Amino acid sequence: KIQHIEDIKKIRNIEKTVKGISNIPLFDISTWNSGEQYKHEIMKKYHTPSVDCIQDYKYSYEINNNIKEKIIKKIGVDDEKKCVIFPSSTTAICCICDYLKKNNYDKICILEPSYFSVAPCLDSFGVSYYKEYISLDENGIPIIPFSSIVNNKYNAVWITSPIFSTGIYYERQNLCLLKKLNQKGIFLIIDESISSPNKYIANTFQENTISIISPPKYIGINSQKFSAVICDYPLEQFLFDWIDVFCG
């Protein structure tokens, strides 16, 4: 069982009980959906092309390269980087966990707090991981456990930006430390799925890095969301081979 989901089930049962007693519906503070006013305003500016055919398969790996190049340019990463489109961030996480397993990354560090599906996905693929915890200084600036990561000799670090459930982004001094980890040969997986586009940190690192972004999620467009994985050529080829297995 996934503890996070079990906890949500308990909360939902409590909500039902309270509603049954008071007959007052509770406000769902964990919903991903936007308010009605925001939806109304965003639809004034959001236009999508009409669908010309609903019968044929449309595979994500058949998306025009021009579109992927525009995404790469928008993020500001090196032109040599590649872009692989996934239906969602969670499916991207699954494929990345599979990559870690198949390429012998056997000591993963998850910087906590992280998205709830990361640890269960690593578990399901049989990838060993350990958790290191971010703290905040007196000014609210994140403190990365740099020495612990180096001393424990992790070969990959899973980072969530902004720090999950906090809205706190990494400061310049944090990025310098992450860059040092990268220069030591540590593979960085950066989940920027709910990051503001002007706060992406993928362009801080040149190689041995993978970044997950999901631009529609940031502005609350959840019914047509996608996830883009920014990576180097060898990893792109791996994901192309396996995306059809996991995503259909």
Where in the sequence are the language-model features?
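PLP-dependent aminotransferase-like
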Residues: 91, 98-161
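Short, conserved active-site loop motifs that form the nucleotide-linked donor/cofactor pocket
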Residues: 83, 186, 209
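PLP-dependent aminotransferase class I/II
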Residues: 212-248
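Active-site phosphate-binding strand-loop segment of PLP-dependent enzymes
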Residues: 136-197
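N-terminal "arm"/small-domain region of PLP-dependent enzymes with the aminotransferase-like
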Residues: 1-66, 186
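Conserved beta-loop-alpha segment that forms the PLP phosphate-binding cup at the N-terminus of a helix
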Residues: 64-71, 79-105, 227
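Short acidic, S/G/P-rich loop/turn micro-motifs used as interaction or catalytic elements
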Residues: 33-36, 163-167, 218
